[in-house]
Swiss-Prot record:
It is an enzyme of class 2 (transferase). Its EC number is 2.5.1.19. Catalyzes the transfer of the enolpyruvyl moiety of phosphoenolpyruvate (PEP) to the 5-hydroxyl of shikimate-3-phosphate (S3P) to produce enolpyruvyl shikimate-3-phosphate and inorganic phosphate. The gene is aroA. GO terms for biological process: amino acid biosynthetic process; aromatic amino acid family biosynthetic process; chorismate biosynthetic process. NCBIfam families: aroA. It is found in: Cytoplasm. This is 3-phosphoshikimate 1-carboxyvinyltransferase. Monomer. 3-phosphoshikimate binds at residues 20-21, 25, 166, 168, 314, 341. GO terms for molecular function: 3-phosphoshikimate 1-carboxyvinyltransferase activity. The active site is at 314 (proton acceptor). GO terms for cellular component: cytoplasm.
Amino acid sequence: MKLITNKQGLVGAITVPGDKSMSHRSIMFGAIAEGKTVIRHFLRADDCLGTIKAFKALGVKIEETEEEIIVHGTGFDGLKQADGPLDIGNSGTTIRLMMGILAGRDFDTVILGDESIAKRPMNRVMLPLQQMGAKMHGKDGSEFAPITINGKQSLKRMEYHMPVASAQVKSAIIFAALQAEGETIIHEKEKTRDHTEHMIRQFGGEIEMDGLTIRVKGGQTFTGQEMTVPGDVSSAAFFIVAGLITPGSEIELTHVGLNPTRTGIFDVVEQMGGSLVVKDSSRSTGKLAGTVVVKTSDLKGTEIGGDIIPRLIDEIPVIALLATQAEGTTIIKDAAELKVKETNRIDAVATELNKMGADITPTEDGLIIRGKTPLHAANVTSYGDHRIGMMLQIAALLVEEGDVELERPEAVSVSYPTFFEDIRSLLK
């Protein structure tokens, strides 16, 4: 696919699609709640539609209208054995959280996905769930999908110190803990996104959060809710960077989710001297959201590492692009988690942006980016990773001559089906 290039400035306003993490979880909580849950501004992208498909296979009635998703909850005990394996496609969130949800059910389940999912590590979820009494294993006894979950297990409480900062692992344990006897205590290594914890409260449950420690009791029941999913800050990040680095730009992004566990990119933009303003912030059905305005800025290099990394882990590919247009060196560290995403994002970012003229050195846990460098035409690939594909389209906006050809552009539909249309809508 030929990407959009050499456009002088992006100007206008858009509303980015609903938050991917929250869209997944809204279906999950709607399913395990009693009664009806109505979800607006749901992300109708491949990953989240896969979560709907999985719960339909488990016997949950889910209606889809133009404006809403309506989930008729069954409670945990109303979930039924699927007729065959659950195919969750490309979604790491779905497979890992479903492992927690299904660990305590009274039937067996096999969960599988695409070739990317088959390469992603699942021991980080399986091992703590097995400590709670779950029985599950990967293909041929490995840690890789397909994952077989043997039901009819009685889950017990545990106290767990997380070895990695992962919201997916934490959420899988929480879902299992809701079905276990007693109170489970989780100690996070670093603070990660807390949508699962907030949704427990939104759906009428109880959970204690004190710094990095979480306490959750088993045997809880939930009640269906009405909710509006705010815009995904991870999707907004591509337009934030586009607005900062494309000459003559000013972009307004409306109804963007502002959960503090997700807004690390705002802090980085401020460190680098970028113009980013948040206005009209409000709580929509309990969720903090607002309008983000960015404009073309002169940027300087910075160092990114430590406890900010979980707050911007998904934005690092496009932050790396931002750094190529900043004066000086930017160092990103403590981000080894990028190696086990849809692809090895450390290598993918360095390889593809270097093809376009960037000066990036990959490291064991991050990237060293030397700026400022002009970018030129090249043939690039997304590696089947939505965030790499979208980052490369933003990079292409800076190319003045020649074409940028992207292999595997279809990956973008995993999280942002209208991405290329929204880019075109902002062209001067």
